[in-house]
């Protein structure tokens, strides 16, 4: 199934609902960072959550950075997303594999930890970026994105995030949904949705059964879904050698000189995608001649 996100209004237009298939997105992250199962699930849910959140609160050229750190074994997680369906992300410790939890599922809560925060920084292109931060309430991440929306955006919501990792560490499926309660929603409609959410299978199980994002929304709202938009989603990094050269120019000149004299070159590695950029002595000398850093 191709990776794409669906935007809709649903339930007699009392809810705004989003669903995404993002298996390829998470598989690309797993390939680039060589994540093991628990880390794959944690990073994957973070990528899916950011895709859904960005599509629901951003527009135009706006961007966001989601940071999660629960002081668990995977360490900090950072994901960048935009309104156009593009994400990139990484975590500090990709080689984390843990015993399954009591439901025989990957223990994302243990991997992420619960002693920490989820923060979202929104850059609207004008003025200073705005950051909202909430304490982690679960570590499973779906509930944590839900709590963020309620606390920082004042939007009652439900978020479901799911990643299935195969025995060989490859990504089986990944996806999720986000439902926002609109002001005209009745108590009866909200109660009905809550009951549906309780009885609903995991998104990963639905996707393994061949269900599409549209099918998942239909299941939640008994087919009362009006699709407004569909867009492809992808893992994509905008790093470049030129951007790293600019970063080197901001370093103190003596540090760049040491790279020339002692290391005879430098290798820059992008945290987000793992791509490497080599700088020769001559290239570093050119950087030094244009350096903005102090001596």
From Swiss-Prot:
GO BP field: protein refolding
Record InterPro entries: Heat_shock_Hsp33 (IPR000397), Heat_shock_Hsp33_C (IPR016154), Heat_shock_Hsp33_N (IPR016153)
GO cellular component: cytoplasm
CDD domains, sorted: Hsp33 (cd00498)
Keyword Coiled coil in record: no
Keyword entries, A-Z: Chaperone, Cytoplasm, Disulfide bond, Redox-active center, Zinc
Disulfide bond residue pairs: 237-239, 270-273
One term of GO molecular function: unfolded protein binding
Chief location bin: cytoplasm
Domain of life assignment: Bacteria
Subcellular compartments: Cytoplasm
Post-translational modification note: Under oxidizing conditions two disulfide bonds are formed involving the reactive cysteines. Under reducing conditions zinc is bound to the reactive cysteines and the protein is inactive.
Record carries keyword Nucleus: no
Similarity comment: family membership: Belongs to the HSP33 family.
PANTHER family listed in its UniProt record: 33 KDA CHAPERONIN
Function: Redox regulated molecular chaperone. Protects both thermally unfolding and oxidatively damaged proteins from irreversible aggregation. Plays an important role in the bacterial defense system toward oxidative stress.
NCBIfam families noted in UniProt: PRK00114.1 (NF001033)
Stated name of the protein: 33 kDa chaperonin
Protein's organism: Lactiplantibacillus plantarum (strain ATCC BAA-793 / NCIMB 8826 / WCFS1) (Lactobacillus plantarum)
């Amino acid at each position: 199934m191709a990776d794409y996100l669906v935007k809709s209004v649903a339930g007699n237009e009392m809810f705004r609902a989003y669903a995404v298939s993002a298996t390829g997105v998470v598989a690309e992250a797993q390939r680039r960072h060589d994540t093991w199962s628990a880390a794959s699930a944690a990073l994957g849910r973070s990528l899916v959550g950011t895709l859904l959140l960005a599509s629901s609160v951003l527009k135009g050229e706006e961007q966001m950075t989601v940071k999660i750190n629960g002081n668990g074994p995977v360490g900090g997680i950072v994901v960048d997303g935009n309104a156009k369906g593009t994400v990139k992300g990484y975590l500090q410790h990709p080689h984390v594999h843990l015993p399954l939890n009591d439901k025989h599922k990957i223990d994302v809560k243990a991997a992420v930890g619960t002693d920490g925060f989820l923060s979202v920084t929104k850059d609207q292109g004008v003025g200073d970026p705005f950051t909202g931060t909430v304490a982690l309430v679960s570590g499973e991440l779906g509930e944590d994105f839900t709590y963020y929306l309620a606390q920082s955006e004042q939007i009652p919501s439900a978020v479901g995030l799911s990643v299935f990792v195969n025995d060989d560490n490859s990504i089986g499926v990944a996806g999720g949904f986000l439902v926002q309660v609109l002001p005209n929603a009745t108590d009866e409609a909200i109660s009905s949705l809550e009951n549906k959410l309780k009885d609903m299978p995991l998104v990963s199980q639905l996707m393994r059964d061949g269900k599409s994002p549209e099918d998942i929304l239909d299941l939640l709202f008994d087919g009362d879904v009006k699709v407004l938009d569909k867009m492809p989603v992808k893992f994509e990094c905008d790093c470049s050698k030129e951007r790293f050269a600019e970063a080197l120019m901001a370093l103190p000149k003596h540090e760049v000189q040491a790279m020339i004299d002692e290391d005879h070159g430098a290798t820059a590695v992008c945290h987000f995608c793992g791509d490497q950029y080599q700088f020769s002595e001559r290239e570093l000398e050119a950087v030094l001649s244009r350096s903005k850093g102090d001596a």
